[in-house]
Amino acid sequence: MRPYFFFPLVFAISAQEIPTTLKDQQSLAVTIYNSNLALIKDQREVKLPKGLCQLAFQEVSAQIIPETAILRNLTSPKDFWIAEQNFDFDLLTPEKLLEKYVGEAVEVISVKPRANGEGQTEIRERATVLATNSGAVLQFADRIETSIPGRIVFPKVPGNLRARPTLVMNLNSGADRAQKLELSYLTGGLFWKADYAANLSADEKAMDISGWVTLTNQSGAAYPNAVLQLVAGDVNIVVPQPAPEARKMAFDGLATVSGAAPQMREENLFEYHLYTLDRPTTLKENQTKQVALLSAANVPVRKEYLLRGQSYYYSGSYGDLGDKLKIGVFVGFDNKESASLGKPLPKGVVRVYKEDSKGGAQFVGEDSIDHTPKNEAVRLKLGDAFDVTARRKQTSFKKLPASGKNNNVYESAYEIEIKNAKNEAVTVTVLEPMPGDWEILEKSHGFVKETSRTAKFLVNVPAAGSSVLKYRVKVMW
């Protein structure tokens, strides 16, 4: 049985550090989740000596979650084991380098004019770095300086500073040869979102839709020629990773809404959906890029005008309830194969466009959707109608005696005038949310009880005309 507690001493005395960089990389796979989390699988071929050594796995993500790192030997797993691993994220900068030399001697080179006024001469002095708090303090042989009079020359880079984030593993190799190693780990700083662009037809009865995936890399590392996969769904995470700060990004390959592109392959994964890009791609550090997700043409859509009331209308006397009320405009479609879709739609923003009289695509509104499985309906609010307005008023109200278990019993009547300035007739859906138990006593239009507390009226309004919805209701609670 190997005594584990002796490993740090053995490695500190005799272990040889073997560096590996992206030059050794054989393959790379990146799986990104919706929750600012990604799984990295980095395969490299590294020449390891037999026995104990330190492997410095360089150019890993700066936001790696170290406790998730797993190193596998795919070539010579026999007698291969890891005793300890450390994530070195103290990166080399001029400030850090000077800080590490507090109490140590450095050489300061300054330039001064020659006495004869011809040219300049270099002066080299040794100094001890006393402190770096809010500026450098240097002690020379004859004085103390609080600013650096020239450039500093350091004898070497301290071993605890790294140029790039590095995972250092103390391990034992069973063979002296080149070996294929795979490092898997979770990291923050990589995330994706779906965006959709939809073009409405001239008659607003169909649309073409394309979906794009926007990838953002703020993890502090680059991922060249990676197999890219995306997981759509709400994966549970015990400790959510903090969202990265907004900063200036490099944009690469941002998409337009026209033209067809290869779509990402989709498959089920547990209770989620996995999307795989059909080609390797490079995610540069501090970069945002887009890749095609899906596309569909001639998807049937439904246009809806909606006026929604409020439940407080029915418990008091209000009279005028508003003039020129906004009427929402919605478009809906079915995510079915029969409607030219039938694909899982990751959550994201759907932006809708329509061509003007000259053929130019104009933006007409956007809405967000949640993860939407196939065979579900999608409904988007694009804005409020300009030419279709409403006026609502309460024409009567009275409180009735208590009845049975109901202490609050009210009877009230309403009149909703809907005006249409368009050159075509429209149908407006009026949703009236009613509290408690309710009963429609009189009505000018038919209605359906959409839910236990909602009455739904459909009001046809002629072109350049108006219609009036009237009803009387008794509510009890």
Located regions from the model:
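Sec-dependent signal peptide recognition
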Residues: 1-8
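Long, intrinsically disordered, low-complexity accessory segments associated with secretion
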Residues: 3, 13-477
